[in-house]
């Protein structure tokens, strides 16, 4: 089992934890062996709040990935297009079973002294 910690904005964390957001969009693909994403909620929360299984990684043309994921992407099309502006390829992590921690954890619990800009392998 391999894990990575993702820094995610609080509004998207809320949607992931509620089960409404089934895809997390990124500009870079993680290692193939990753099967669990640790969820770090960025400022103002600044805590590790849960984890989610990674079902699959969808990679492809920006418009194609949008068409495949938009019903459960949790973002507006305008925001998606802005995020991938000047890019040809989009990455979507398909999220599975979500576990919300009873008590949020600190980054130090995962051997990290600061929040990663995007992700960190654990």
Please tell me what each predicted stretch does.
Residues 38:
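Non-catalytic, usually N-terminal nucleic-acid engagement modules in DNA/RNA processing proteins
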Residues 1-4, 8-33, 44-49, 57-122:
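Contiguous surface segments at macromolecular interaction interfaces
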């Amino acid at each position: 089992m391999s894990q990575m910690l993702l820094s995610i904005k609080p509004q998207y964390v809320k949607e992931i934890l509620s089960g409404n957001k089934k895809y997390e969009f990124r500009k870079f693909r993680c290692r193939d062996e990753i099967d669990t994403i640790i969820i770090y909620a960025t400022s103002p929360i600044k805590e590790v709040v849960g984890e989610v299984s990674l079902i699959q990684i969808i990679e492809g043309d920006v418009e194609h990935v949008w068409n495949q994921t938009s019903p459960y992407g949790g973002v507006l099309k305008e925001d998606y297009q802005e995020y991938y502006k000047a890019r040809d390829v989009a990455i979507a992590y398909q999220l599975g079973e979500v576990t919300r921690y009873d008590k949020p954890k600190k980054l130090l619990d995962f051997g990290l002294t600061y929040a990663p800009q995007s992700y960190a392998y654990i």
